[in-house]
Protein backbone atom coordinates (compact mmCIF):
# COMPACT_ATOMS: atom_id res chain seq x y z
CA UNK A 1 0.00 0.00 0.00
CA UNK A 2 2.96 2.29 0.57
CA UNK A 3 6.67 2.39 -0.03
CA UNK A 4 8.38 0.88 2.98
CA UNK A 5 11.74 2.47 2.17
CA UNK A 6 14.35 3.34 4.76
CA UNK A 7 13.10 6.91 5.08
CA UNK A 8 10.21 5.57 7.14
CA UNK A 9 10.37 4.28 10.66
CA UNK A 10 10.02 0.57 10.14
CA UNK A 11 7.01 0.01 12.35
CA UNK A 12 4.57 -2.72 11.40
CA UNK A 13 1.80 -0.18 10.79
CA UNK A 14 1.65 3.44 9.75
CA UNK A 15 -1.54 5.04 11.09
CA UNK A 16 -2.80 8.48 10.10
CA UNK A 17 -3.61 10.44 13.25
CA UNK A 18 -6.44 12.94 12.64
CA UNK A 19 -7.55 14.64 15.90
CA UNK A 20 -9.60 17.33 14.18
CA UNK A 21 -11.40 19.83 16.40
CA UNK A 22 -12.60 20.33 19.96
CA UNK A 23 -12.90 17.20 22.05
CA UNK A 24 -11.60 15.17 19.14
CA UNK A 25 -8.15 16.10 20.42
CA UNK A 26 -9.03 15.00 23.97
CA UNK A 27 -10.39 11.57 23.04
CA UNK A 28 -7.50 10.93 20.67
CA UNK A 29 -5.11 11.58 23.56
CA UNK A 30 -6.97 8.89 25.51
CA UNK A 31 -6.66 6.54 22.55
CA UNK A 32 -2.91 7.07 22.40
CA UNK A 33 -2.54 6.14 26.06
CA UNK A 34 -4.24 2.81 25.38
CA UNK A 35 -2.35 2.11 22.16
CA UNK A 36 0.98 2.77 23.86
CA UNK A 37 -0.04 0.60 26.80
CA UNK A 38 -0.88 -2.43 24.64
CA UNK A 39 2.33 -1.97 22.66
CA UNK A 40 0.97 -1.84 19.13
CA UNK A 41 3.91 -1.70 16.73
CA UNK A 42 2.81 1.42 14.90
CA UNK A 43 3.95 4.85 13.81
CA UNK A 44 1.30 7.56 14.24
CA UNK A 45 1.53 10.43 11.76
CA UNK A 46 -0.42 13.62 12.42
CA UNK A 47 -2.71 14.90 9.68
CA UNK A 48 -4.35 18.32 9.39
CA UNK A 49 -8.14 18.26 9.16
CA UNK A 50 -11.06 20.27 10.44
CA UNK A 51 -12.33 23.73 11.23
CA UNK A 52 -9.11 25.60 11.98
CA UNK A 53 -7.63 24.31 8.75
CA UNK A 54 -10.74 25.55 6.94
CA UNK A 55 -10.53 28.99 8.55
CA UNK A 56 -6.91 29.48 7.57
CA UNK A 57 -6.73 27.63 4.25
CA UNK A 58 -10.34 27.47 2.96
CA UNK A 59 -9.98 23.69 2.76
CA UNK A 60 -10.71 21.49 5.80
CA UNK A 61 -9.12 18.48 4.07
CA UNK A 62 -5.92 19.71 2.39
CA UNK A 63 -4.09 17.75 -0.29
CA UNK A 64 -1.23 16.98 2.10
CA UNK A 65 -3.65 15.04 4.31
CA UNK A 66 -5.00 13.07 1.35
CA UNK A 67 -1.37 12.24 0.49
CA UNK A 68 -0.76 11.12 4.06
CA UNK A 69 -3.70 8.74 3.99
CA UNK A 70 -2.44 7.27 0.73
CA UNK A 71 0.83 6.47 2.50
CA UNK A 72 -0.67 4.82 5.60
CA UNK A 73 -2.53 1.61 6.46
CA UNK A 74 -5.57 3.21 8.08
CA UNK A 75 -6.61 6.27 10.06
CA UNK A 76 -7.98 7.22 13.46
CA UNK A 77 -10.17 10.30 13.46
CA UNK A 78 -11.38 12.39 16.40
CA UNK A 79 -14.14 14.89 15.61
CA UNK A 80 -14.78 17.97 13.50
CA UNK A 81 -16.75 21.17 13.75
CA UNK A 82 -19.11 21.81 10.83
CA UNK A 83 -21.27 24.86 10.21
CA UNK A 84 -23.73 25.96 7.50
CA UNK A 85 -22.50 27.55 4.28
CA UNK A 86 -22.83 31.23 5.23
CA UNK A 87 -21.39 30.80 8.73
CA UNK A 88 -18.46 28.84 7.38
CA UNK A 89 -17.65 31.55 4.84
CA UNK A 90 -17.90 34.25 7.50
CA UNK A 91 -15.32 32.51 9.72
CA UNK A 92 -12.60 32.38 7.08
CA UNK A 93 -9.65 34.64 7.75
CA UNK A 94 -10.28 38.03 6.06
CA UNK A 95 -7.98 37.47 3.08
CA UNK A 96 -9.98 34.36 2.07
CA UNK A 97 -13.46 35.79 2.41
CA UNK A 98 -15.53 36.70 -0.63
CA UNK A 99 -13.61 34.41 -2.97
CA UNK A 100 -16.28 31.78 -3.45
CA UNK A 101 -14.90 29.09 -1.16
CA UNK A 102 -17.56 26.62 -0.04
CA UNK A 103 -17.19 24.44 3.05
CA UNK A 104 -17.82 20.72 2.68
CA UNK A 105 -17.54 18.09 5.39
CA UNK A 106 -14.04 16.58 5.37
CA UNK A 107 -15.23 13.24 6.73
CA UNK A 108 -17.80 12.94 3.92
CA UNK A 109 -15.06 13.82 1.44
CA UNK A 110 -12.76 11.19 2.95
CA UNK A 111 -15.45 8.55 2.57
CA UNK A 112 -15.91 9.43 -1.08
CA UNK A 113 -12.24 10.01 -1.92
CA UNK A 114 -11.21 6.58 -0.61
CA UNK A 115 -14.49 4.83 -1.45
CA UNK A 116 -15.06 3.92 2.21
CA UNK A 117 -18.42 2.52 1.20
CA UNK A 118 -19.36 0.74 4.42
CA UNK A 119 -20.13 2.55 7.64
CA UNK A 120 -20.20 -0.03 10.41
CA UNK A 121 -21.86 1.01 13.69
CA UNK A 122 -21.99 -1.62 16.47
CA UNK A 123 -24.44 -0.70 19.24
CA UNK A 124 -24.04 -3.14 22.12
CA UNK A 125 -25.20 -2.81 25.71
CA UNK A 126 -22.26 -3.35 28.05
CA UNK A 127 -23.05 -4.91 31.45
CA UNK A 128 -23.12 -2.46 34.32
CA UNK A 129 -23.82 0.63 32.22
CA UNK A 130 -26.69 2.42 34.02
CA UNK A 131 -27.55 4.25 30.78
CA UNK A 132 -28.53 1.05 28.95
CA UNK A 133 -32.12 1.09 27.72
CA UNK A 134 -31.96 -2.68 28.14
CA UNK A 135 -29.02 -4.93 28.93
CA UNK A 136 -29.68 -7.37 26.06
CA UNK A 137 -29.30 -5.01 23.10
CA UNK A 138 -26.82 -6.04 20.41
CA UNK A 139 -27.51 -4.21 17.14
CA UNK A 140 -25.10 -3.59 14.26
CA UNK A 141 -25.99 -0.92 11.70
CA UNK A 142 -24.63 -1.13 8.16
CA UNK A 143 -24.97 2.26 6.51
CA UNK A 144 -24.06 2.87 2.87
CA UNK A 145 -21.44 5.57 3.13
CA UNK A 146 -20.87 7.32 -0.20
CA UNK A 147 -24.20 7.84 -1.98
CA UNK A 148 -27.78 8.99 -1.24
CA UNK A 149 -28.36 12.64 -0.31
CA UNK A 150 -24.74 12.82 0.84
CA UNK A 151 -23.55 12.63 -2.77
CA UNK A 152 -23.51 16.43 -2.69
CA UNK A 153 -25.47 17.04 -5.90
CA UNK A 154 -27.43 20.09 -4.77
CA UNK A 155 -28.74 23.32 -6.23
CA UNK A 156 -29.82 26.66 -4.81
CA UNK A 157 -31.06 28.47 -6.70
CA UNK A 158 -32.05 25.72 -9.14
CA UNK A 159 -30.64 26.48 -12.63
CA UNK A 160 -33.01 26.83 -15.57
CA UNK A 161 -31.46 23.93 -17.48
CA UNK A 162 -31.90 21.57 -14.51
CA UNK A 163 -35.54 22.58 -14.18
CA UNK A 164 -36.07 22.20 -17.91
CA UNK A 165 -34.71 18.65 -18.00
CA UNK A 166 -36.68 17.58 -14.94
CA UNK A 167 -39.88 19.15 -16.21
CA UNK A 168 -39.55 17.26 -19.48
CA UNK A 169 -38.76 14.01 -17.66
CA UNK A 170 -41.27 13.97 -14.81
CA UNK A 171 -44.77 15.38 -14.74
CA UNK A 172 -44.67 15.97 -10.98
CA UNK A 173 -42.24 18.83 -11.58
CA UNK A 174 -45.11 20.80 -13.13
CA UNK A 175 -46.49 21.74 -9.73
CA UNK A 176 -43.37 23.83 -9.09
CA UNK A 177 -43.63 25.86 -12.30
CA UNK A 178 -44.68 29.01 -10.49
CA UNK A 179 -41.87 28.83 -7.92
CA UNK A 180 -38.93 31.12 -8.76
CA UNK A 181 -35.49 29.54 -9.04
CA UNK A 182 -34.21 31.43 -6.01
CA UNK A 183 -37.10 30.14 -3.90
CA UNK A 184 -36.32 26.50 -4.60
CA UNK A 185 -33.54 24.24 -3.31
CA UNK A 186 -32.88 20.75 -4.59
CA UNK A 187 -30.80 17.81 -3.34
CA UNK A 188 -30.64 14.64 -5.41
CA UNK A 189 -30.96 11.24 -3.76
CA UNK A 190 -28.67 8.97 -5.75
CA UNK A 191 -28.45 5.24 -5.10
CA UNK A 192 -26.65 2.87 -7.47
CA UNK A 193 -27.32 -0.82 -7.82
CA UNK A 194 -23.68 -1.60 -7.07
CA UNK A 195 -23.67 0.66 -4.02
CA UNK A 196 -26.75 -1.10 -2.69
CA UNK A 197 -25.36 -4.56 -3.40
CA UNK A 198 -22.04 -3.80 -1.71
CA UNK A 199 -23.55 -2.70 1.60
CA UNK A 200 -26.18 -5.45 1.57
CA UNK A 201 -23.62 -8.17 1.00
CA UNK A 202 -21.37 -6.73 3.70
CA UNK A 203 -24.30 -6.91 6.13
CA UNK A 204 -25.13 -10.53 5.30
CA UNK A 205 -21.48 -11.61 5.42
CA UNK A 206 -21.08 -10.00 8.84
CA UNK A 207 -24.30 -11.59 10.05
CA UNK A 208 -23.09 -15.00 8.93
CA UNK A 209 -19.55 -14.61 10.29
CA UNK A 210 -20.58 -13.47 13.77
CA UNK A 211 -23.65 -15.63 14.25
CA UNK A 212 -26.43 -13.07 14.06
CA UNK A 213 -29.86 -14.39 13.10
CA UNK A 214 -31.45 -11.69 10.97
CA UNK A 215 -30.85 -8.77 8.62
CA UNK A 216 -33.44 -5.97 8.53
CA UNK A 217 -33.44 -3.67 5.50
CA UNK A 218 -34.59 -0.23 6.64
CA UNK A 219 -35.95 2.06 3.91
CA UNK A 220 -39.11 3.90 2.81
CA UNK A 221 -40.18 2.22 -0.47
CA UNK A 222 -43.88 2.97 0.03
CA UNK A 223 -43.12 6.66 -0.64
CA UNK A 224 -39.58 6.94 -2.05
CA UNK A 225 -40.36 4.23 -4.54
CA UNK A 226 -37.42 4.27 -6.91
CA UNK A 227 -34.41 4.72 -4.62
CA UNK A 228 -35.66 2.89 -1.54
CA UNK A 229 -37.31 0.39 -3.86
CA UNK A 230 -33.95 -0.39 -5.44
CA UNK A 231 -32.38 -1.05 -2.04
CA UNK A 232 -35.20 -3.36 -0.95
CA UNK A 233 -35.28 -5.29 -4.23
CA UNK A 234 -31.54 -5.87 -4.17
CA UNK A 235 -31.72 -7.00 -0.54
CA UNK A 236 -34.34 -9.60 -1.43
CA UNK A 237 -32.14 -10.94 -4.22
CA UNK A 238 -29.02 -11.24 -2.09
CA UNK A 239 -30.92 -12.68 0.89
CA UNK A 240 -31.65 -15.80 -1.20
CA UNK A 241 -27.94 -16.66 -1.04
CA UNK A 242 -28.04 -16.81 2.79
CA UNK A 243 -30.66 -19.39 3.63
CA UNK A 244 -29.92 -19.49 7.35
CA UNK A 245 -30.47 -15.76 7.88
CA UNK A 246 -33.93 -14.25 8.28
CA UNK A 247 -34.68 -11.22 6.12
CA UNK A 248 -36.89 -8.53 7.62
CA UNK A 249 -38.12 -5.32 6.03
CA UNK A 250 -39.10 -2.11 7.82
CA UNK A 251 -39.94 1.46 6.88
CA UNK A 252 -37.60 3.95 8.55
CA UNK A 253 -40.35 5.65 10.57
CA UNK A 254 -41.77 2.37 11.87
CA UNK A 255 -38.24 1.09 12.52
CA UNK A 256 -37.58 3.96 14.91
CA UNK A 257 -40.74 3.10 16.82
CA UNK A 258 -39.92 -0.62 16.99
CA UNK A 259 -36.37 0.04 18.12
CA UNK A 260 -37.69 2.03 21.07
CA UNK A 261 -40.32 -0.62 21.82
CA UNK A 262 -38.43 -3.90 21.25
CA UNK A 263 -34.74 -3.25 20.46
CA UNK A 264 -33.69 -6.68 21.71
CA UNK A 265 -35.45 -8.37 18.76
CA UNK A 266 -33.13 -6.82 16.15
CA UNK A 267 -29.56 -7.67 15.23
CA UNK A 268 -28.15 -6.45 11.88
CA UNK A 269 -29.73 -3.45 10.13
CA UNK A 270 -28.81 -2.38 6.59
CA UNK A 271 -29.83 0.90 5.03
CA UNK A 272 -28.86 3.84 2.86
CA UNK A 273 -26.78 6.81 3.96
CA UNK A 274 -29.28 9.28 5.45
CA UNK A 275 -31.51 6.68 7.09
CA UNK A 276 -28.39 4.98 8.47
CA UNK A 277 -27.21 8.27 9.93
CA UNK A 278 -30.54 8.64 11.73
CA UNK A 279 -31.14 5.11 12.94
CA UNK A 280 -27.57 4.55 14.14
CA UNK A 281 -27.80 7.53 16.50
CA UNK A 282 -31.08 6.19 17.84
CA UNK A 283 -29.44 2.81 18.44
CA UNK A 284 -26.50 4.53 20.14
CA UNK A 285 -28.82 6.17 22.65
CA UNK A 286 -30.27 2.76 23.53
CA UNK A 287 -26.86 1.66 24.80
CA UNK A 288 -25.77 4.81 26.62
CA UNK A 289 -25.52 7.56 24.02
CA UNK A 290 -22.88 8.83 21.62
CA UNK A 291 -20.21 8.40 24.26
CA UNK A 292 -20.45 4.66 23.52
CA UNK A 293 -20.91 4.95 19.74
CA UNK A 294 -17.92 3.81 17.70
CA UNK A 295 -17.77 3.42 13.94
CA UNK A 296 -15.65 2.25 11.06
CA UNK A 297 -15.62 3.69 7.54
CA UNK A 298 -14.39 0.73 5.55
CA UNK A 299 -13.38 0.28 1.92
CA UNK A 300 -11.55 -2.41 0.00
CA UNK A 301 -8.05 -1.15 0.86
CA UNK A 302 -8.42 1.50 3.52
CA UNK A 303 -10.43 2.33 6.62
CA UNK A 304 -11.01 5.30 8.93
CA UNK A 305 -12.21 4.66 12.48
CA UNK A 306 -13.95 7.32 14.56
CA UNK A 307 -16.35 8.00 17.42
CA UNK A 308 -19.62 9.34 16.08
CA UNK A 309 -20.01 12.30 18.43
CA UNK A 310 -19.28 15.89 17.46
CA UNK A 311 -16.49 18.21 18.50
CA UNK A 312 -18.35 19.77 21.50
CA UNK A 313 -16.17 22.93 21.48
CA UNK A 314 -17.30 24.14 24.92
CA UNK A 315 -15.74 21.03 26.49
CA UNK A 316 -12.51 21.13 24.49
CA UNK A 317 -9.40 20.64 26.59
CA UNK A 318 -11.38 19.78 29.72
CA UNK A 319 -11.22 15.98 29.41
CA UNK A 320 -14.88 15.76 30.37
CA UNK A 321 -16.16 13.89 27.33
CA UNK A 322 -16.55 10.12 27.58
CA UNK A 323 -13.67 8.57 25.59
CA UNK A 324 -15.21 5.09 25.40
CA UNK A 325 -16.54 5.63 21.86
CA UNK A 326 -13.00 6.48 20.77
CA UNK A 327 -11.55 3.46 22.57
CA UNK A 328 -14.14 1.17 20.97
CA UNK A 329 -13.17 2.67 17.61
CA UNK A 330 -9.58 1.73 18.40
CA UNK A 331 -10.78 -1.82 19.04
CA UNK A 332 -12.50 -1.84 15.65
CA UNK A 333 -9.25 -0.70 14.05
CA UNK A 334 -7.28 -3.44 15.78
CA UNK A 335 -9.77 -6.06 14.58
CA UNK A 336 -9.51 -4.69 11.03
CA UNK A 337 -5.71 -4.95 11.27
CA UNK A 338 -6.10 -8.58 12.44
CA UNK A 339 -4.65 -7.69 15.83
CA UNK A 340 -7.34 -9.65 17.66
CA UNK A 341 -5.25 -10.34 20.76
CA UNK A 342 -4.62 -6.65 21.34
CA UNK A 343 -8.25 -5.77 20.57
Where are these regions (language model features)?
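Solvent-exposed alpha-helices and their adjacent loops that cap or buttress functional pockets
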Residues: 10, 67-69, 112-113, 130-135, ...
Amino acid sequence: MFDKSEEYIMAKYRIAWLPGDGVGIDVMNAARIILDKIGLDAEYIHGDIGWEIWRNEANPLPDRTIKLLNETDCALFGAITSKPKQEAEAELVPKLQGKGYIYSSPIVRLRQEFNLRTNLRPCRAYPGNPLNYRDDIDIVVFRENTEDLYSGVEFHPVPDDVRRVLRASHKKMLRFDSTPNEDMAMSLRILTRQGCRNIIRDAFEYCQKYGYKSVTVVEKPNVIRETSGLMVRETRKIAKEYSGIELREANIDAMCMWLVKNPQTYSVLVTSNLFGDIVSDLCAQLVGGLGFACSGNIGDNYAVFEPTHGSAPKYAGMNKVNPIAMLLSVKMMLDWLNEGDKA
